[in-house]
Amino acid sequence: MRKRVVWGVWSVLTMLATPAVAADGPVQIASTIPYLNEQVGSANVRQCDWNARLSAMIIERSRGGVVAAAQEDLSSLPGTTLTIKITRAHTAGGGSVSGPKWGRIRMELREDGVVTGNHSVRRVSNRPFTLSACGPLDKIADALADDVIAWLRKPAIDPNFAWDADLETAESAAD
C-alpha cells in the first residue's frame, strides 16, 4: 500500500513538473492577444480584458511550456513563437437576451522563423441569457486556452490557413 501511495505522489509531481506542450524550449506568445484588425469585435468586446486573460490562461495551463515574450512583435524573436490573433468575437450588446457569445482565434507556430503549424479555433457559449458582457468572453478565453494547449501537444499545418480568411459570411449563414 505504501508503495502505491509513493508511486501516486511521484506520478502527480512528475506530471506537474512536465510542460504541457511538445516543444524543445518555451513557446513565446504575446502578453495580450491582439485583434486581427479594427473590425473585429464591437465596442462591448473591446471593453473587456479577455484577450489578456486568454494569454495568461495559456501560460498558466502550459506548466512552463509557454511564456510571455519580452516584446509584442514576435516575428523577430528567435526560438519558438506562437502568434495568436482574435479574428471574431461577439458578446452581449442588446441587454440580457442577446443570443450566444463566441470567439475565434487563429494561430501560427514558428521555430526560428519557419512555420511549423497553424490552426483556427472557435468557441461558442450556450448561455443566451446573461447580464454581463465580459463574463461570457472570460469563459470563452478559458476554453480557447485549453484548445491551444491541446493543439500545441501535436501541432499541424493546415493547408487552407489564412489570417484574413473571410469567415463572416459563412458563419453568419450558419447562425
Predicted regions and their residues:
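Short, low-complexity, polar/charged sequence segments that are solvent-exposed and flexible
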Residues: 46-52, 101-106, 140
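Surface-exposed short loop/turn segments
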Residues: 65, 70-116, 122, 126-131
